[in-house]
């Protein structure tokens, strides 16, 4: 542990320069799917200045084995929300496999993100959620241009992830993004403003299973295409989920009874291949954390 602290009485601020060993600390960063257990060698070098209203991190360098996070000129408010930054460089591994390798730069109101890999599971789960714990402050705005060679969602890889977006007052206001599972299978995501506070999220995926991990009532799922639409604001959302041409091995008893009305349904059950469905259509509303 090495530290240098300087107090500026006139401006009521404090400058700091720390070199910290974090071996005994456990560290978890959800949005990067990064998890360091205690008693693993790691180091944090950080310098900057703070007062009662803000924290400015001039340089941050975190390292642990082959994991590294570098941040330059990060400005935070007194709620530790991001007001601005110059650069964020991330390289992290999980089970000795690289899952994040990207570089984000901000120049005035333009944000450029490029890299080889990005673990996007957490990002997609939060697309239409306006959490109380906000990453960006109301002062943060900018136009985003991104291109990443590979993204990972629920342990599945997609390629050539690219698009444009816009952040206004700390919230994702617009987004168009595309990626490829293969030459003829795509993922398409968009967020468009509908009114002053309401937005529309649209997702189309040629592989539906990727987005069904959290639906506990659907098990043994295979095949299928997915189309998801959600109109939402910071209080509630109205959503529609459609899935086409898929099979499910474990389904509620009512679905089995209905499927047995067809000869194909009997054949599917006898072979153990699962029950075939042409289309699944579900509407649901959320108010806060509650689904209706």
What are these regions (language model features)?
Residues 1-292:
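Membrane-proximal interfacial segments on either side of biological membranes
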């Amino acid at each position: 542990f090495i530290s240098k602290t300087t107090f500026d009485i006139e401006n009521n601020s404090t400058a700091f320069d720390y070199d910290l060993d974090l071996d005994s600390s456990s560290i978890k960063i959800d949005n990067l799917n990064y998890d360091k257990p205690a008693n693993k060698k790691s180091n944090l070098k950080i310098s900057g200045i703070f007062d009662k209203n803000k924290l400015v991190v001039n340089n941050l360098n975190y390292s642990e084995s082959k994991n590294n996070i570098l941040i330059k000129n990060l400005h935070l408010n007194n709620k530790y929300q991001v007001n601005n930054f110059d650069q964020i460089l991330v390289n992290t591994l999980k089970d000795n496999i690289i899952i994040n390798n990207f570089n984000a730069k901000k120049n005035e109101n333009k944000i450029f993100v490029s890299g080889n890999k990005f673990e996007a599971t957490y990002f997609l789960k939060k697309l239409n959620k306006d959490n109380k714990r906000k990453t960006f402050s109301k002062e943060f705005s900018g136009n985003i241009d991104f291109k990443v060679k590979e993204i990972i969602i629920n342990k599945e890889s997609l390629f050539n992830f690219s698009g444009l977006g816009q952040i206004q007052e700390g919230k994702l206001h617009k987004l168009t993004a595309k990626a490829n599972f293969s030459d003829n299978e795509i993922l398409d995501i968009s967020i468009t403003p509908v009114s002053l506070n309401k937005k529309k999220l649209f997702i189309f995926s040629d592989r539906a299973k990727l987005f069904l991990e959290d639906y506990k009532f659907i098990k043994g799922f295979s095949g299928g295409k997915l189309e998801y639409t959600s109109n939402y604001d910071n209080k509630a959302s109205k959503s529609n989920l459609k899935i086409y041409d898929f099979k499910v091995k474990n389904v509620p008893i009512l679905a089995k009874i209905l499927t047995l009305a067809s000869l194909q349904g009997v054949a599917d059950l006898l072979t153990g291949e699962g029950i075939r469905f042409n289309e699944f259509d579900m509407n649901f509303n959320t108010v806060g954390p509650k689904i209706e």
